[in-house]
């Protein structure tokens, strides 16, 4: 049985943005799921519009629409590249597009899947208010304006004329996105923590799609369905702060980890669920033609959805049900509500009309099941028996025209779609004499079949067949298409039920994916709290532990008795990995995932800031400037619930400037009444001087432990990095040892040790005493001695130079 190709197309996202003072309204439409998103927020600093950049990064629009009356700084922020390879086109439209009256009119007549057709205007407004804030002028203007643009650009489908005389726009859902309910991370944080990583297709011609590389999302994504992968990506893009939702996800993961067989059975079933949202969009489009592959995928998907419900109904033992009740899970009830009996009806409806194997068996395009329509069956039987019938008619015709008979290829009557029935004569065209005898023959056209030329004629018999049978193939197609259109219209009546089931399965797929990863990698359930603290026991880095044979875990404890952690230590000692693992454990906790640790208590975090030296390939700023920008946002926007990470901040400029900038940043946080949680990694050991940093109980110092049996030993190979975080400070970087580990030649490292020792003892650096250099010096001395002995007035200058340069 053929299946629809399971490919995920890049989503087309169209966005509109308007500014009203400091209040910004954003709406964007995702064509892949026919979903309209709307949000508004307050920009504290209208000079850089940081929240707009964050929304752009998350939505990844292909086009942004704005009013022609927008401020230049606002348009510049929309045009700004967020550092990724994708470039966004900003298109200015007339300001009246976003007028409140026109926008309100568009929203009132918006058709959302599941909305009753008989609702009046007041009831429509009530229905919409459950999905967005219709009382917000900014939200109404931006979403209504975007709908007008989508209609004018023919991006969305429009339905019949409504009572006002204009067409209604049809979409699947409207969703308000409140930013204050999410953990915020910008593109720099995603890059630094390697949450997403896109590997471009290696083709130089640009053929082929990019794929997810070695990233946190790539490792956690074990989803079996396209809808699950999309939803999980949105979870990673927008981690949440809702404790109730997070606990519900964690409870579900705990349950599935305790019932591995059930998890495996569900995941195997979900592999048969294709992209139903995409199929419904195709069914709803008047220009799309549904193939047998589409119907195969649709039927297999519904069958799999029904099987998921059956697994929950009969495949869950009483002990597992008791386990569910202990976790306060309502998965069985939710499955029964979402995967309703209407899906059974849709399956029986489609299977009663469509035969997905018929096209392959019959050799032509036909989908309607045999026995469904007697008239159609009769036409198809005639069409399938047409070659034998025409062969008989041809033989009878040749009896009337014996002089047309040829030995190799006798004339025959053929059927050509959209043209009709014709007499085909091979090799030579009938001459005038023959046509005078055959008065009923009328030349139509000629063509080549390989090396044989064919000539086609209308005859009285072919005209009779035209009148009797007509263009039978297209009669069949027209009749089948009418039947399938009727089937589609009935199927689409259940779109809301199908989408409800799809949304349930997508969420289930995400939970199963996270549970699978947690079970495979021995993750634990984090404890989430409203208190602003962080307590991790034996935390690990999500990706690093996959890449090494042995990973050394570390503890983290950030509370009111030390919210600023300054970590010093050698290169290669694991400081950066530690900082990132802390952030990733916090990040995964806000997705509702288990985390790589023995235990973790995580306070809700509103934002993760990263100044970690990450640089986008397309960024127009230096790494140091990017870090300065990140630190500037930390100082302005960080709250007591934020997590700020600084890795080697200050190294991109003069040492004195770097010390001053880092010291000033830490001092600012230390003097805050309620500072954020701050983790700093640095080699600027001058900061350890009391003149650089204030004495504060909020600051704690840590270092990465190093084992060196004899501190006086000159053998650098005896140093062992333990990758263990311990309280304390260190002034040593062990840079020479790191150079050896990195493969720097040993003679270079030894010379570096001599230079370093001379520098520390304030002595002159001894000149290199290599054999090659010594022989060169001796040759130069000999040349000088010979020149001193030469009597220029009497000597042979030519012989002198020849002697020097040959020697």
Swiss-Prot record:
Gene Ontology CC entries for this record: condensed nuclear chromosome; cytosol; germ cell nucleus
SMART domains per record: MUTSac, MUTSd
Recorded GO MF terms: ATP binding; ATP-dependent DNA damage sensor activity; mismatched DNA binding
Compartments, as annotated in UniProt: Nucleus; Chromosome
SUPFAM superfamilies xref list: DNA repair protein MutS, domain III, P-loop containing nucleoside triphosphate hydrolases
Function: Involved in meiotic recombination in association with MSH4. Required for reciprocal recombination and proper segregation of homologous chromosomes at meiosis. Promotes homologous recombination through facilitating chiasma formation during prophase I. Involved in the control of class I crossovers formation.
Record family assignment: Belongs to the DNA mismatch repair MutS family.
Record protein name field: DNA mismatch repair protein MSH5
Organism: Arabidopsis thaliana
